[in-house]
Amino acid sequence: MKQFRRVMLFLLDSVGIGALPDAEKYGDAGTATIQHTLEGNPGLTLPNLERLGLMKIPGMEKFATGAKPQGVYGKCRELSKGKDSIVGHWEVMGVPTRMAFDTFPEGFPQKIIDAFTKMIGRGILGNEVASGTEIIARLGEEHQKTGFPIVYTSADSVFQIAAHEETVPLATLYQWCQMTREMLDNMGFGVGRVIARPFVGTPGNYVRTANRHDYAACPPEQTDLEILTESGIQIHSIGKPVDIFPEAKFTSTVKTSDNFIGMGEALKAVREKEGLVFINLLDFDMKWGHRRNVAAYGAGLKAFDDYLPLFQDAMDDNTLLVITADHGCDPTHTGSDHTREHIPVLLWHRGITPGAAGIRETFGDVGATILKALGAPSPKVGNSIL
């Protein structure tokens, strides 16, 4: 395998490709994010992803048009327990989660709420499992009258704090979240993420803003990102990776508010950066998957597909393109939570020999491939696909 100057890793957040064998345990039997999105959007085609091999991946054959693959293609099983962003990202970077994070299907225990309210000096609203947009619509007006933050969770391991930007300044909300991260760690609760969920607007017209910020738990072991750094190889974050890996020493970070900004920043980075450029495109998950918007999810896939030729044209001979995901969020499934699925993996560089990578045993094969491509030592978990 040749060495590359840079690897461009696009992680399409929640773009799963079919239920894992144990999906039924998670209430996700039969889920298939990409497949059901295509079925729910008659006439939708993804010709550029198909050229990379997407429709040759097991489970995608019915959508094939006969285009000859030009890349390496496959899908990965998950070793970790769980189905959220932390678990998926960590395993992609070589650290499967052996113990599931704590979840709170009945809301947070009183001792957590008591500690939180004492810490911030005021009460709370909520403390329930809820959709973010729904609970803001329901409790937003009371929040603005009282100044009490809205605290809620989901099926994932998250402690979410919502506040109106004119009622609780962003700096205060972020401080609360950082303090909560430390509080939960000190209390011995394994919570994957504390998330600031700011919103604006008036009663009946509240909308969440792009000022979300995640405060993630630190991985229990060294990730592939540290291996790259210790090898003298740069790592760059576009979007969410810097929030998911708080211990990583990113050479540069760029915040993004939507997929289009992320894709634009990636186009600049492929011309300017070296090492690993890690791009998370979050709209698939946050704006369309959780909201079960099949049409918008399809439009998002189409927008990325349309972008691919422009991006590939900007790649030189020393650049490897990797496309993958972290979990599913099937927009046709019941509820609003993530779905436990395989993730796709598509690889392309100039001169690549096309072929099938099969069904891989761990998401960690993605990270292992990146390490090998950049000339770094092999990880403990994962085997290179190339």
Describe the residue ranges of each PLM region.
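Feature captures the catalytic ectodomains and active-site-proximal regions of enzymes
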Residues: 1-386
